[in-house]
């Protein structure tokens, strides 16, 4: 199975405006066969957001998603990500700026900055901006991912959307591990239009399969080989060092005899060819 829609890594608009593609590390590289890809952008300067949104349209993205929920300290310090929750009027300006490119614009955010009770005022404000879709991560910025997502708030959030912006789609995010769980969330909460899976894919690379199944060593390692091939194919565009691949090894090298030892060896490799050689000899 595959997702119905994909989102790029979140990309800083101001960084791109001032330094070009080299500033964004290949985050907006798009191939012709990627036809359902939304560009997720962040920033705190409306003029820069407008410029990058136009560029994304030229690249062939099908929409713009503004990240107003990332808790990363550097993004928040710059006024972006979850920092937008503290500047609601600027958030509205960023959405309006993105719309000037003519693509559908959505927003991804959290319940609030520090307190869960912030959710009603904050989401009310965003829903008044006439976004195509609102994705709500069911935690605050302060909570990060340290507490369970507040699924109990979904019915109230649905009711708020229905009252203010019934045409805005509502997507739920946070602690959604796979397609099966996502479908249950939708079934249990009439009015929810979809779910977004983020970190879940790092725990289970088969998160989107329609029929959950047990996957064994060879299948997991073949997926790792595929990622190595894709890295080699696109590395001239993304310009990312080999070591950035290492954080993905644990996704595939797990849950089989000798996985820990193999993973340790892989962490000492210096090229994709070294990884392939280790896998071939293991």
Question: Which functions belong to the PLM regions below?
Answer:
Residues 13-15, 72, 142, 201-204:
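Short gly/pro/ser/thr-enriched loop/turn and capping motifs at secondary-structure boundaries
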Residues 21-22, 28-31, 73-84:
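An active-site metal/cofactor-coordinating segment within enzyme catalytic domains
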Residues 119-123, 127-133, 152, 156-172, ...:
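Alpha/beta catalytic cores of nucleotide-metabolism and tRNA/nucleoside-modifying enzymes
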Residues 50-64, 68-78, 89-170, 189:
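Alpha/beta enzyme core
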Residues 6-7, 40, 65, 106, ...:
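Conserved beta-strand positions in the central sheet of alpha/beta enzyme cores
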Residues 9-10, 68, 138, 198-199:
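Short secondary-structure boundary segments
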Residues 1-58:
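Glycine-rich, positively charged N-terminal anion/phosphate-binding segment
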Residues 79-85, 143-144, 212-214:
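Short glycine-enriched, charge-decorated loop/helix-capping segments at active-site entrances
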């Amino acid at each position: 199975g595959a997702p119905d829609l994909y989102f790029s890594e979140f990309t800083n608009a101001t960084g791109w405006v001032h330094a070009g593609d080299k500033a964004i590390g290949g985050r907006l590289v798009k191939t012709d066969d990627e036809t359902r890809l939304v560009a997720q952008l962040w920033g705190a300067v409306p003029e820069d957001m407008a410029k990058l949104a136009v560029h994304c349209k030229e690249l062939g993205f099908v929409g713009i998603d503004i990240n107003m929920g990332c808790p990363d300290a550097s993004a928040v310090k710059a006024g972006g990500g979850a920092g937008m929750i503290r500047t609601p009027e600027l958030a509205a300006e960023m959405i309006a700026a993105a719309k000037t490119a003519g693509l559908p614009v959505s927003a991804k955010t959290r319940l609030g900055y520090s307190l869960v009770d912030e959710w009603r005022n904050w989401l009310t404000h965003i829903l008044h901006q006439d976004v195509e879709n609102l994705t709500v991560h069911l935690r605050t910025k302060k909570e990060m991912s340290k507490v369970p997502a507040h699924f109990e708030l979904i019915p109230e959030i649905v009711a708020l959307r229905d009252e203010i912006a019934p045409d805005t789609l509502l997507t739920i995010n946070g602690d959604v591990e796979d397609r099966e769980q996502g479908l249950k969330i939708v079934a249990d909460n009439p009015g929810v239009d979809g779910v977004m899976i983020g970190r879940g894919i790092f725990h289970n690379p088969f998160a989107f399969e329609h029929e959950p199944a047990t996957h064994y060593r060879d299948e997991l390692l073949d997926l790792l080989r595929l990622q190595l091939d894709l890295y080699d194919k696109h590395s001239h565009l993304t310009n990312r060092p080999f070591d950035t691949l290492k954080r993905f090894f644990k996704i595939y090298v797990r849950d089989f005899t000798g996985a820990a030892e193999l993973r340790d060896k892989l962490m000492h490799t210096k090229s994709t060819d070294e990884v392939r050689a280790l896998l071939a000899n293991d």
